[in-house]
Amino acid sequence: MQNRIYWNNSNNNMQKGIALATCMAIVMGLFTGCGNKNDQQIAASPDEVQKGRYVETELSLPEEWKDKNISQIFRSGDELHFLVAGGAEGQVSLEEWMLGEGDTLTEVTKDWLKALPDGKGLESRDSFTLLQDAEGNQYLYGNCYRDEESSSAHLWKEADGSALDITPQKWLEPMDMDGYRFYDTPQYVTLTEDELLVGLSYFSLDVVLAQDGSLVSSQESDSLTDSGSLSDNKWVSAVGDTLYLAQADEQGNVNGLLQMQLDGNNGAKSKGEIPFSQDSYSSAYFSVLGDGTVYAADADGFFRCDAGDTNWQKLLQGIDTGFSLSDQWCRDIVALSDGSVYAWFGSESGDKIMIYRYDPDAVTEVTEELTLYTVEESFFLQQAAVQYHKQHPEILIHVDAAISMTDKYSGNADYQQIYQDLNTSLTSGNGPDLMVMDHLKLDTYASKGLLLNLQEILQPMEEDGSLLSNITKAYEETDGARYAVPLQFGLLLAVGRDVQPEEMSSMDAIAKAVSRKTESYMGDRTCGELVEEFYPLIVDDILQNRQVNRDTLRPWLEDLKKIADNCGILPSRKEGRAANIWDLGSDVKLVLQETDGFNEAMMPYAVAELLNANVVSMENAFYPKMVIGINSRSEHVETAKEFLRFALSEELQSVDTYEGFPVNAKALETQAAADRSMAEAYTTYDIDGSTVEFAIKSYSEETANHLTELCRAATLCLKEDTQIETSLTESLQAYLNGQASVEEAMDAVEGSLKMYLAE
C-alpha cells in the first residue's frame, strides 16, 4: 500500500531531502537553461573595491509577539503587513500589523477580526490568510486541520463590522479516494482585482465569488500544466487579472512560473510562462509586484525578473541568505516596489523576518575562496559553509556536490566514475581544497600523498573529550596518521518482531536464529541485495596483504548461506523492492535499519512500539558519514584546517539534519535532549492485512539516553568498496542457490578480485 504521511513541521527544505531518503510521500546546485539567472552586478577588476549589493538583516519583532505565531506576511498597497495569531486554545486572537518607517511595527487590526474567534474553536497554530480588496474590505481564510472526519476550511468576509461565514459548500463536502475520506481544501488562496477568490488545493483550482462564496468554476490542478505538476507548496498569487502558479518537474524542482488568465466559468487558461531552472534542495518562493515584476528566492540566492522579461537577475548569493541554512525554513517572501524583499522563516526557536535591501555603500568582502567537494549533496555541509562564511565574511566555501539527492535515491549514481574523476582532478593539481569522500577508496588518495595528515587537528580534540574517539579514529593508520575523519555517523539497528534481542545482535546470531525457522524472516532477496546488506561487516577484513583472507571470508559465507536459505534467493527482482521496516507488520519478522541520527531513530522505535518489537544495535556497528579530508596540495591548507575544526565543533554539530549522529560529544548530548515534537509525523501502517493509524512520535528520555550509549559504544566501522561488492555479487549466486560449495565460492571470489588486487 501507499502510506499517507502528515508532518507536524513546516521545514520544507529538510523534508524535501527526507522524502527522498525515507521514500515517504512528502522532502544546491546551479541554475541553467532557459530563464538564466545572471549576476546583476558587473565584476570589478582585482584592484577595485566593488560597492553596492543587497544585504541581509533581521527585523526586530515586538515583545507583544513573544507568545504568538506569525500566520502570514503580505503586501497591502505597497506596505508590508503581518497577520499574527495568539491566545489560548479554542479562543485564538488574530492581529494585523503594519511595518512603517524605521522598520517600526504598528497594530492595525480592524474590529471585525478582533471579534472573529468566538465559538470557532480555532488555534494559534492554524493557518490563516487575510485578503483585502481595493475598497478595503477584508476576507479571512482559515485552514484548521483537526481530523479526517471534518473539513479544515473556513472562509469569512467582513460584513458590517462582524464576520460572515461564506465557506464554499465544495470545501465542506468529503471526498473519497481509494477508501480514504478527505476534504479538497485549498492550501493557498488569493484575491483578484475582480473580487474573485481563488483557492489552490492538491487536486483543484477553485474560483469563488468574494461576495458570497458561491463557486464560479473548479478545475483539476493537474490540467493547469502541459508537463510536470504544480510545485509542492501549492503557491498561487493574483496580480490584476493574472494568476501566477509555480510549476515543478518530476523531481519537485520548480521549472517555471505559469501565468494564467481567468475565463469566467471556464476557469484558468494559459497566458504565458516565465521559465525558472532549479536544482536546489530548498523550495522556491515567489512574490509578484503589481507591474508584473517577479522576485524569487531559494537556497541558490535571490533573483528578479522584470515585467515582460523571462531572464532572471541574481541579486544575492544563496550563501549570504537564510535560505542556505538547514535549521530554518522559509514560509513566504514579499517584495515591495522599492526593491526590498522580506522573507519569513520558521525555526525551532520561533519565527524570523529577514530583510533584503540594496545598500549602495556595502562592500563585497570575500578575499579567499575554497571549494568543498562532496560526493553527495548534504544539508550539514551546506550549513557548515554558510555558518563559516557568516563568521568569516572574507572567506567563501563553495560546496560542489557530484550527486544530487535525487540521483542518490534514484540509484543513478556511478561512484566508480566519480572516483576516477576526482582522482584525475587531484593528480593534475586542480583538485578541491576539502573533500568529502563517502563511497570512495580514500586509501588510494592517501597512499599517493594527496591527503593531509589531520592528526594535529583531531588528537587534541579527542584527548580533551570533544570528539567521540571511537568514531573519529575509524581511519587511523598503523603509524597513527589520519587522512580523513567522519563528521557524522549512522547506527546499524536490527528491529525484530517476535525476535529476541540476542537473536539479532550479530550476523552470526541472525544466521543461527533463522536457520531454525521455516518461515522467511527477512523476506526474499536477490544475491545482490543480500550481499549489499551484509558485506560492509567484513569489507575491511576480507583483503590482507593483497590477498583474499579466506579465514575471514569462510564464516561470513557460511552465515550468509544460512540467511539466504531462510530468505529465499530470487534470480532477479523484476518489480517491487526488498522488504524494509514498512513491511515488518506483515511480510517479514526482521529488518536491518541504517539510522542516521536521533530524529531518524523515531521511525524504528515507533514501529517497535506499534508492533511490540525489539530494537538492538547490531554488532555495535556504525556507518561513517561525510568522511572529510584536506587536499595536501591546496593553496588554502590553513583555512581548510580551521574550517574542519569548525565542522567538528559543538556549535555546528548540535543541529540534527537527518544525516547522522554528531561526532562532537557535547553536541551528541544536546541532540539527545532536544525536543523532537516538530519532527513527529502521522501516517498509516499495515499489520497482518489491516491498515492502522501510525504516529511516528518522539521517544522517551530513556530511549534517547540509550541511543547515546549505543553511539559511545559503537566500534565496528562499516565501510564500502563497490568493487568488492560487485565481485561478491557476481561470485556467490551459485553458492547461495546451493549449486556450489563454500570452497568453490571462495575460489570464485578470489578469481573475481584478481584484477582488483593487482591494481
Language-model segments: what does each one mean?
Residues 455-458, 476-572, 632-638, 741:
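Helix-loop-helix "hinge/cap" segment bordering the ligand-binding cleft or interdomain interface
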Residues 439-493, 508, 512, 608-615:
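Hinge/lid segment of periplasmic solute-binding proteins
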